[in-house]
Amino acid sequence: SRLSKPLMETLAVIAYRQPVTVNEIETVRGVGADHSVRALVERRLVEEKGRKQTPGRPVLYGTTDEFLHRFGMNGLADLPPENLFSPVPARVPSEP
């Protein structure tokens, strides 16, 4: 099944910044990520990779072999350069 935009955004953050915590994902995206991470784990695209050695020992997430297979990659080195995904303004200001 296709992934929604929030799931794709969360998956991209995990793919490029792994291992990463939910809090770190939320910092990058600016919105809650618990639901998205849970959905990606259920789809076997993301899995727990351990725990961060900080207070609270939050779970670290990373991509799976299923992620690589589904997106036609042999490894994370096959990811396109992250700078291809620069933010695009929601609207272009009109010229005076």
What is the meaning of each model-derived region?
Residues T10-R17, R70:
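Short amphipathic alpha-helical elements of helix-turn-helix/winged-helix folds
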Residues R17, R43-R44:
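Alpha-helix C-caps/helix-loop-beta hinges
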Residues R44-Q53:
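A short, conserved structural fragment
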